[in-house]
């Protein structure tokens, strides 16, 4: 999906969507998100790590962030320079430690659970601060990767942010043509194929969240095969029942939207039948997949 035009941007209070529109867009099943974030602790740690290293304007940005997350003011509380401040924390490795970035990202992951975070995301249309950082996920420390995976996963909590993750509008970054959906795909694949158990688990949650999105199939045209291949490779890593269910749900969805996925399962495997008997819900998904890809 392309990014909305200025006329299509949500209102500042996020209340102008019609009820019928909301009902059509809400996924049939709730997204899987990471809510185990102590935001007061995260902000306290962030303030200590930033002490003496930021400008007066950036101190104001931190105060605005506190208003947004603790005092529950709307995202309107965040000034126009908020993302400039975030970008400096994420990218200035000389001034800020990995721990600073981790607490910043975990703070963003908490903010991602709010429906009006979409206002912040739309402010990033020009500079792509967030998606460019995500594109480099394999270059960040393991802890930064885990925090960013949580942020990505939590953006699926509400309709607007989850749609933002799947925008197909392109831009150039480090000699590559990328888009939100391609970056989201890269994050999902990186996580699911990681040796880190935490990343694997969140990766399976992200894939599940992608699968339950009610979007036009054209959105997945360029990424369905890549995601399916990652899932098949993931099947060889002894996943648990929850992870099997999530990734089978995604595989079934990608089978619906891309005929190439059927060929990939047949040629590369393994066939999901190897998980038969894990649970009733897993068996049901295996039946659905086997109708298109006989074992």
Regions found by a protein language model. Give the residues of each.
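Eukaryotic intrinsically disordered, low-complexity regulatory tails and linkers enriched
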Residues: 1-31
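Helix-loop junctions that connect tandem helical modules in alpha-solenoid scaffolds
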Residues: 45-54, 88-99, 132-144, 186-198, ...
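Alpha-solenoid helical repeat scaffolds
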Residues: 103, 147, 151, 187, ...
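Eukaryotic acidic, Ser/Thr-rich intrinsically disordered low-complexity regions
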Residues: 257-295
């Amino acid at each position: 999906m392309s990014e909305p035009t200025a006329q299509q941007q949500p209102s500042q209070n996020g209340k102008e969507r019609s009820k019928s529109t909301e009902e059509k867009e809400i996924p049939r099943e709730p997204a899987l998100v990471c809510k185990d974030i102590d935001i007061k602790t995260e902000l306290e740690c962030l303030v200590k790590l930033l002490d003496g290293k930021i400008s007066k304007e950036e101190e104001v940005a931190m105060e605005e962030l506190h208003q947004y997350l603790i005092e529950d003011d709307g995202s309107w509380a965040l000034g126009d320079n908020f993302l400039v401040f975030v970008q400096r924390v994420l990218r200035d490795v000389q001034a800020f430690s990995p721990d600073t970035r981790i607490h910043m990202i975990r703070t963003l992951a908490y903010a991602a659970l709010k429906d009006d975070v979409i206002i912040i995301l739309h402010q990033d249309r020009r500079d792509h601060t967030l998606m460019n950082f995500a594109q480099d996920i394999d270059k960040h420390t393991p802890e930064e990767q885990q925090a960013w995976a949580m942020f990505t996963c939590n953006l699926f909590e509400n309709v607007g942010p989850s749609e933002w993750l799947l925008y197909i509008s392109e831009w150039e970054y480090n000699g590559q043509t990328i888009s939100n959906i391609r970056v989201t795909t890269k994050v999902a694949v990186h996580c699911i194929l990681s040796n880190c158990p935490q990343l694997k688990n969140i990766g399976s949650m992200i894939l599940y969240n992608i699968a339950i999105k009610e979007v036009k199939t054209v959105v997945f045209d360029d990424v369905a095969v890549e995601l399916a291949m990652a899932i098949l490779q993931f099947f060889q890593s002894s996943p648990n029942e929850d992870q099997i269910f999530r990734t089978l749900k995604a595989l079934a969805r990608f089978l619906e939207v891309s005929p190439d996925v059927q060929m990939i399962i047949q040629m590369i495997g393994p066939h999901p039948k190897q998980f038969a008997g894990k649970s009733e819900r897993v068996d049901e998904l295996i039946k659905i997949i086997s109708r298109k890809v006989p074992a």
